[in-house]
UniProtKB/Swiss-Prot annotation:
It comes from the Bacteria. PANTHER family: CHEMOTAXIS PROTEIN MOTA, MOTILITY PROTEIN A. One of its GO terms (biological process) is chemotaxis. The keyword Ion transport applies. Coiled coil: none annotated. MotA and MotB comprise the stator element of the flagellar motor complex. Required for rotation of the flagellar motor. Probable transmembrane proton channel. This is Motility protein A. Belongs to the MotA family. InterPro entries: Flag_MotA_CS (IPR000540), Flagellar_motor_stator_MotA (IPR022522), MotA-like (IPR047055), MotA_ExbB_proton_chnl (IPR002898), MotA_N (IPR046786).
Amino acid sequence: MNIVIGLIITFGCIIGGYMAMGGHLNVLVQPFELMIIGGAGLGGFIMANPMKVVKDSGKALGEAFKHSVPKERNYLDVLGVLYSLMRDLRTKSRNEIEAHIDNPEESSIFQSAPSVLKNKELTSFICDYVRLIIIGNARSHEIEALMDEEIETILHDKLKPYHAITTMGDSFPAIGIVAAVLGVIKAMGKINESPEVLGGLIGAALVGTMLGIILSYSICNPLASQVKIVRTKQHRLYIIVKQTLIAYMNGSVPQVALEYGRKTISNYERPSIDAVEQEMMNPGGENKAA
């Protein structure tokens, strides 16, 4: 919603201010200049990035528009799954725990948290490290170092669309100048025309410079910033898993270990301790009620 509101304010102020100065709106309508700038920017974007990053950039923009960040229910689902697994680690046999992590789709623990099960990467992350805990030979600081390395790699991959879109946005002002120069070249071909005709042609050419700047600083870079915000918040789920499991490996009981994970959540989004306790008593309770 913020993106839509921001775009309305941006274009409303630019176009409204221009018309209030007495400008004519039809002069700004230059579809071929937009084609030059947008096409050159998109072509460079495709050349500069692997197809996987190109596709992920489209997905990331969709997430930014929908603001697909974890909500309280998502955090509670993660904490609920971790609590159930840690409880079973203390009370049940290795075979029973392996049944959950080998086939999470069929596990009652993961089925109670559909938002976790839907996130295949996060589910795999949880299962991999619970499996290492079951083995029992690894020390907590070794697991923590391994987790840090994987989490850093995941974040690096998740932010590739941000860097790719930012780079494309930074190129638009220069591409806008290219479009403007091409417009001036066209105008020079009619140098013998009247000043009214030449003025219109040169004005149309200058629209290219304006479009390049607007595409960069008012559209592309703000969208990239929103992509970074969304992807970074999604990444927070991995930090919760890491802090919780490491606390458990260091000797904390499951209830206390959950607090290590809960405290990593931003104050604006952190579920209350009462909500977490309710989740421990009834994992996925809200989902079942729904």
